[in-house]
Amino acid sequence: MFPKSLAVSRKNSNLTKGVSGLRRLCSSSSTITGSPCPPRYDVAVIADLIEKQHWSKLGVHVTDINPNELFRQLISSELDPDLCLRYYSWLVKNSDISVSLELTFKLLHSLANAKRYSKIRSFLDGFVRNGSDHQVHSIFHAISMCDNVCVNSIIADMLVLAYANNSRFELGFEAFKRSGYYGYKLSALSCKPLMIALLKENRSADVEYVYKEMIRRKIQPNVFTFNVVINALCKTGKMNKARDVMEDMKVYGCSPNVVSYNTLIDGYCKLGGNGKMYKADAVLKEMVENDVSPNLTTFNILIDGFWKDDNLPGSMKVFKEMLDQDVKPNVISYNSLINGLCNGGKISEAISMRDKMVSAGVQPNLITYNALINGFCKNDMLKEALDMFGSVKGQGAVPTTRMYNMLIDAYCKLGKIDDGFALKEEMEREGIVPDVGTYNCLIAGLCRNGNIEAAKKLFDQLTSKGLPDLVTFHILMEGYCRKGESRKAAMLLKEMSKMGLKPRHLTYNIVMKGYCKEGNLKAATNMRTQMEKERRLRMNVASYNVLLQGYSQKGKLEDANMLLNEMLEKGLVPNRITYEIVKEEMVDQGFVPDIEGHLFNVSTKS
């Protein structure tokens, strides 16, 4: 704390500086606009009024000069920029006068010259947050009115930061690019929040652009910046590029940390395809070799990745290693294992894991119960599912929509449609709004029971609410095709398009399969033409399988043979279903396919 005398001395020094600046200003024969300050001004009083924020008195005192003009003259003087900032704030708040960008950024230049950086940050944050409608190019023109590139760079850097912190990522990205055009050097402190804002909007390509520009402009990245870039690349499956960025870190003297490795491991786990978990495991080994200890997040990522790769033993091995290293599992760890066990039909082991979870002091949550109820339903254990559902409600927890949907689906699959509808009504009484999944379960149940009319009625209710999705249409289409009414299924294509939904291969395959089962190969072929010409969807393996089976079962084996050759000529690889159709519908019927120049061994099943 400064002595009182010193504080007063400093205040008087600011006031003296303000007074001397105004004295020079008002003794000048002309202003910037050529209008002299009225000679009767008591400049000491003006400065003192601004210092003390006596704005009503100031307004009376300067009636002979435009407030905006006074602001221009204050900035041009040697008045302390803090006083100019106070006057600006008062002017904007208490008058209809709009301050030009040129004057606004002159103020910021004066603050930057005085090294009042925190005030610039605060000013720009409010400037952006309050919805400034100024275009970025106009702002940069105003910034460039000062010849000091260093000062301009500081202001541009803080502007990008303000845009990023206020979720104005579009403007922040444009400001970043314009900074490059003007030659203003930004810092990692503004680039990192900008990249995070872009990443939240799934603009990974723009994150990669910012990173490359940082390298080109010689902006020193830090470990946090690198981690954001790695995350963006992993989200889009660019794992090789993410690996390259890890190498770049070393070049810039940054060591990858646990977040870097976790992001890369998670990227491999979510990538899909053969060998993904082998690569994730390799990153884990590299991590340990570089003396970076795996944490709870690392283990959770691997547990989840292994069971989703149909490698439940791998998940259990990671869980054991986790315990061996004294890393305490959390609810996410247990939920992943319970999900994996339920998915693999190991219900009793899933229940046992839930019990271990509780014994370890980790309380199950709705995700835990969702996983267990889903496991019960998938394994025809409806009674156990309902008991657990009752237990959830008994604990005062509110069941999720997904939980209700699983039970409704289980009822419908057992043919207990009325019970499914009763549960939907209970759901609504509890204030839980049924979603499209709820209706899809009920429509599917009605279709399976052959009650297509009731299914269509429920579909129409859903349509009136604007809720149907592609799954809804597919369910009803399959219902019509199952009843031998494929023409009605085909008519739903138009309704689908009216709702802005785009048919996929599966959509057309359902209708083609329906026509083939009815023996109407001409209609099936017309549907293929519609798919290829109107929707520009090329036949895939599943589409060819539908027609292959249709032609074969109709006894048109030569035509089926031609389709098989056409499929191979287009470079499509037969799958297990293709081989089964060829064997059962062609070879076993005494017809050996004539494959023209292609290797096709019917004894092999891929």
Curated annotation (Swiss-Prot):
Pfam families: PPR_2. It comes from the Eukaryota. Belongs to the PPR family. P subfamily. PPR repeats lie at residues 152-186, 187-221, 222-256, 257-294, 295-329, 330-364, 365-399, 400-434, 435-465, 469-503, 504-534, 540-574. Keywords: Repeat. Gene3D superfamilies: Tetratricopeptide repeat domain. This is Pentatricopeptide repeat-containing protein At1g09820.
